[in-house]
């Protein structure tokens, strides 16, 4: 397979997918990013609801996730134990995305914080208690009644934690990560606005 520079499909303006993969992976320190996606109409979406109990220090902006509860409808899980572990791992990643992970780029498009010394991810101590349950359903078009589960479990914690932090502080956050600095500044700004009202 080839990628063409323009629609003329001239031989001198094409490059193989193998060359694209090699150059982007081994000879360049810029990561590949997905810019297009496709979803099949025969693949019904899974659903998930999440709830979080958080504790927010209104002086420092520190957030402790005390308890996270998730209920997932992924059809009939083929392997319930693996589905549970995948859900717990996805929730942990989602908590990291919501509260810690801040990808920063240089002016040349390279990732600035490209090591775990600079890029904070949550530890088990940062995550709190995670409880997972599954809604019993059967998907006719899925294998053995199952639906997908992968991306759903990573996406749900961000809005759940943003709402929990809003309930604790009265401050809305619409950009991730919701860091202690952003929370503390948001609380100070809200106090100033409330005092001027």
PLM-predicted stretches and their roles:
Residues 1-197:
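Cofactor-binding beta-sheet edge motifs in enzyme active sites
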């Amino acid at each position: 397979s080839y990628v063409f520079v323009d629609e003329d499909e001239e031989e001198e303006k094409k490059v193989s997918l193998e060359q694209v993969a090699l150059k982007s992976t081994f000879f360049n320190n810029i990561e590949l990013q997905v810019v297009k996606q496709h979803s099949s109409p025969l693949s019904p979406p899974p659903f998930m609801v999440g709830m979080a109990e958080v504790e927010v220090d209104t002086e420092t902006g520190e957030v402790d996730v005390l308890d996270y509860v998730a209920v997932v409808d992924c059809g009939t899980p083929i392997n319930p134990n693996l589905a549970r572990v995948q859900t717990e791992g996805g929730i942990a990643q989602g908590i990291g995305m919501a509260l810690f992970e801040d990808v920063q780029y240089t002016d040349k498009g390279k990732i600035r914080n490209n090591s775990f010394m600079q890029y904070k991810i949550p530890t088990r101590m940062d995550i709190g208690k995670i409880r997972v349950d599954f809604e019993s359903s059967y998907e006719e078009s899925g294998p053995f009644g199952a639906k997908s589960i992968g991306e759903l479990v990573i996406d749900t914690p961000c809005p759940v934690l943003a709402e929990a932090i809003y309930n604790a502080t009265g401050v809305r956050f619409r950009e991730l990560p919701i860091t202690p600095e952003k929370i503390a500044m948001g609380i100070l700004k809200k106090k100033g606005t409330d005092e001027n009202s």
